C-alpha cells in the first residue's frame, strides 16, 4: 500500500503544467554540459590547451585526463552510470520513453504542443544515443522503456 501523499507517475501527467515539468526536468535534465570548459573532454584533454588559472579548488575533469589520472574503474566522463558528476544517459533515454508512453494521459493538451513535445522527446532519445555512441563505440539502442520488474531477458537485451 502506498501512502496517498507520495506522488505517482500518473501525477506527472494530470495536466499540462505537470507534463511540462516532467519533460523539462526528467527528459531535458540529462543533457550533458558540453559547453563548459570543465565538462568537455575535447577541450582540456589535449596538449594544445592549458588552463593557467587552475588551482586545487577547481575540478576540471578533462584536465585530469591530461595529468594521467584517468582510470577504468572511475572514469571522469561516465555517461553510462552517471558517476563523477556526469549524467547517466540511459536513464535519460528511459525518462523520454516514459514521457512518450504517458503523454496521451494529459487532458486538454494542445495538439501542436503535444506534437512538439513528442518530437523533442524523440530528438533527445537520438541525441543521448549519439552521445553514448561517441563516447563508447557500439552500444545497445533502447527502443522503449523497460519495466524494472520484467524478466532479465527483457531488461538486458542482446545486440
Give the ranges of each region predicted by the language model.
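Short clusters of hydrophobic/aromatic residues that line enzyme substrate/ligand-binding pockets
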Residues: 13, 70, 141
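Acidic helix-start/capping segments at beta-turn-to-alpha-helix junctions
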Residues: 44-49, 117
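Proline-centered turn/helix-capping motifs that create local helix->coil transitions or kinks
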Residues: 1, 35-36, 132-141
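Short, solvent-exposed loop/turn elements at domain surfaces
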Residues: 33-41, 50-55, 60-62
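Short linear capping/connector segments at secondary-structure termini
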Residues: 5-8, 143-151
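Conserved, well-structured interaction surfaces
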Residues: 16, 21, 29-33, 59-136, ...
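Membrane-proximal, proline-rich intrinsically disordered regions
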Residues: 1-45
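Short, hydrophobic secondary-structure boundary micro-motifs
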Residues: 39-40, 109, 141-144
Amino acid at each position: 500500500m502506498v501512502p496517498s501523499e507520495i506522488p505517482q507517475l500518473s501525477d506527472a501527467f494530470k495536466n499540462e503544467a505537470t507534463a511540462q515539468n516532467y519533460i523539462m526536468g526528467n527528459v531535458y535534465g540529462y543533457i550533458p554540459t558540453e559547453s563548459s570548459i570543465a565538462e568537455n573532454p575535447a577541450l582540456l584533454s589535449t596538449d594544445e590547451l592549458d588552463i593557467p588559472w587552475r588551482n586545487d579548488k577547481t575540478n576540471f575533469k578533462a584536465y585530469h585526463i591530461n595529468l594521467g589520472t584517468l582510470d577504468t574503474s572511475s572514469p571522469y566522463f561516465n555517461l553510462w552510470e552517471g558517476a563523477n558528476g556526469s549524467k547517466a544517459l540511459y536513464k535519460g533515454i528511459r525518462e523520454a520513453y516514459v514521457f512518450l508512453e504517458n503523454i496521451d494521459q494529459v487532458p486538454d493538451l494542445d495538439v501542436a504542443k503535444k506534437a512538439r513535445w513528442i518530437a523533442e522527446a524523440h530528438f533527445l532519445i537520438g541525441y543521448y544515443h549519439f552521445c553514448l555512441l561517441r563516447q563508447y563505440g557500439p552500444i545497445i539502442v533502447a527502443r522503449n522503456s523497460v519495466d524494472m520488474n520484467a524478466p532479465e531477458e527483457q531488461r538486458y537485451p542482446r545486440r
